[in-house]
């Protein structure tokens, strides 16, 4: 249900959430959604595309090429998966004849050892973080229980990139991953993990052991889940769970139940984090709308699940609440529409905001129902398609379904542009 009112609370350090295209390989056009100015009919929308053409980065890819060969070539994961824009992107209406993104999977599946039709990869353990490759055909996926990060592809067998030691007790483990904004140069990945004593943020270099960035985040029997995202080339935002204790989320001296800002993340002499937002329950997901720079925060509290918004002007509002607590998880946003995974009800819904007011224009639309069951992560690929990753093996489903990485719109069309874009 929509919130009763909008808060004018300000959050330090989350301004400038509109970002510049990073240097790296070409990205395909990404379809966007836009509601009419003035908050008119939310279903009358038009498709836009943003063309990002950048220089191909040739250095530092040899280590990753061995992971995904076959017909897909070398899997590439660069700055653009972690670094949002720092300048307003130029948006131009595309001709009506511009086709939407094609079906994300080939008509004939690659003959993998794990036969899982209709997905990029099957036979996974319960997943957490997901990073799409710049070719829209490869990805990095994290397994929460095992701590493994796997390189996967639509046309190659998976390969383990690294295994991070974690304690998966309760809902902890390897909870999210994100690439450095300068990944093409430094090959660094950040992870949010559980240890036997705490939750923490670590940095992982290729072929090296994890190095601590932020430690001492309270750990509990539940409420450990969280998320990571870069809101600028130098700012890492961390959403931490309340460790099962809402009082910790309200305690300014605790790192639990917060959206934290880490400036210039480093393993030596790290500046203490600052709190951007308090009162977080169990973490769901973080996502940025690259068109208007809004940061969306999905979390689960004792009274309701909710979706909050932090604008590029650092204003905070509650976008939507779910009193029935369907289990909000990962999200993806584009031009005022936010897709949110609901784990308990096996749904993905689209929440739409009016551009002039930021108010929700109606009940969330269901864009996925039951397909692949319980999905957590949700990420957009550069070609405009949307991908999810499931947590069936740990979601209490009696069927004990395999966990997979799958396209949200298998028939193509990409990010939903109107209420007819449903599966």
Where are these regions (language model features)?
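Short intrinsically disordered, low-complexity coil segments enriched in acidic
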Residues: 1-6, 314
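Short, low-complexity, intrinsically disordered N-terminal modules
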Residues: 4, 14, 18-21
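Sequence/structural signature of beta-propeller domains
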Residues: 46-48, 52-423
